[in-house]
A protein has these predicted regions:
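N- or domain-start disorder-to-order transition segments that initiate the globular core
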Residues: 17-39
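Hydrophobic faces of well-ordered beta-strands that scaffold small-molecule active sites
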Residues: 34-39, 53-56, 113-119, 151-155, ...
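Conserved, mostly hydrophobic/aromatic
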Residues: 57, 117, 153, 189, ...
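Active-site beta->alpha loop and helix N-cap motifs at the rims of alpha/beta catalytic domains
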Residues: 60-61, 68-158
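Active-site-adjacent beta->alpha loops and helix N-cap segments on the catalytic face
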Residues: 126-130, 155-167, 183-187
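Catalytic alpha/beta core domains of metabolic enzymes, predominantly
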Residues: 176, 181-286
Length: 350
């Protein structure tokens, strides 16, 4: 009788465990395989999904600044910049930097990990200016009591940007190299011992759909997914410590197609879909599987070979420059918003 009861109790326990497993959301399962990062400056969304890390960019900062609830942050940033003695155009630029950091500080109150903050994209081809701006952003964070380990400075993956990040990493300033579209960029980042890279998935897919006139690719042939898998496998095969964070997703299928990647930065809209999805999620990438994959060998890289390979890769070349231009435009929009808010042009003319 006792053994019969024990058997029934065990059956009930196993049934309950299976039921719980069946109702686990895709997002919850993904978090067990990959570090999930919020690709957003939306504080409400970050608080809702509770990712470990968060990423921002000029477009996201500008969108957040346009919200009414950001008014106080903007006013505080402007006041601080003015008290520091900045005037005219320099006042606007300093306000943008302070505001960007202030958003980062607010985000860090909601997460346990790191926030990525981007350097002015107009500096993407200027190594020294990028270094100087990154140091300024780092110093601003320190002024708010934020440890360096909780910040990643985002820099575009140009040759000049990667060399700037190499210097910053040596100084103890961790970097996130963004707008990355090819293995040649990933190799340069590895050589520079960068903390983290952000290869873009969705933008690669968009480019190929337009270039090849294809409406959709099956996930196993998705050019963006395959690009990240190649980079991930190369890093694991070579024992490279730089973390790979897939970015710029167009669908949850792309996200789940890279389950197991070191990190994935995901927009709130897709996080919401994953939270409602109960499909089974399995690792698509792993260090062990990378060792079994086709071996990837790369020759030693120089500035000349990097630039030559970039120019030969039309997709990477166009998307890198297009991404830089887009981020510059977003920063210009934020500059205009601030000028209109504070009547800066009228003040300058006076």
């Amino acid at each position: 009788m006792t053994s019969s009861l024990c058997y029934k109790e065990l059956s009930v326990i196993l049934f309950m465990k299976n039921a719980i497993s069946m109702t686990e959301t895709a997002l919850h399962q993904l978090k067990n395989l990959t570090t999930v990062v919020a690709d957003s400056s939306d504080l409400e969304a970050i608080e809702k999904f509770r990712p470990l890390d968060a990423t921002t960019n000029p477009s996201l900062i500008t969108a957040a600044a346009e919200q009414p609830e950001s008014k106080q942050l903007i006013e505080d940033a402007y006041t601080q910049a003015k008290q520091e003695g900045y005037q005219s155009d320099a006042l606007i630029e300093r306000t943008i930097d302070i505001l960007t950091v202030k958003f980062g500080v607010e985000i860090l109150k909601l997460i346990d990990g790191r926030v990525s903050t981007e350097v002015d994209a107009s500096l993407s081809y200027n190594t020294e200016a990028t270094i100087a701006k990154a140091r300024e952003l780092s110093k601003l964070y320190q002024g708010y009591g934020i440890a360096q380990s909780r910040i990643l400075i985002k820099i575009a993956s140009t040759w000049e940007g990667i060399q700037a990040a190499k210097v910053l990493e040596a100084e103890g300033i961790p970097c996130n190299l963004t707008l990355l579209f090819g293995l040649h960029q990933a190799q340069a980042c590895a050589d520079a011992k960068i903390t983290l890279i952000s290869p873009f998935v969705g933008r690669i897919l968009d480019w190929y759909k337009k270039a090849e006139g294809v409406e959709q690719y099956p996930i196993e042939k998705d050019p963006g997914v395959l690009s990240v898998k190649q980079i991930y496998n190369y890093y694991k095969q070579q024992g490279i410590q730089t973390q790979v964070m897939g970015a710029s997703f167009r669908s949850t299928a792309q996200v789940l197609g890279l389950a197991g990647c070191d990190l994935l930065t995901i927009a709130p809209s897709l996080l919401s879909q994953l939270e409602q999805d109960q499909q089974s999620v399995k690792a698509q990438l792993s260090a062990e599987a990378a060792q079994q994959a086709e071996k990837i060998e790369r020759p030693a890289q120089t500035k000349e070979s990097f630039k030559a390979e970039l120019e030969q890769d039309l997709m990477a070349f166009q998307l890198l420059q297009g991404g830089i231009d887009g981020f510059i435009k977003a920063r210009d929009q934020l500059s205009l918003l601030l000028r209109q808010s504070f009547g800066i042009d009228a003040e300058i003319k006076a």
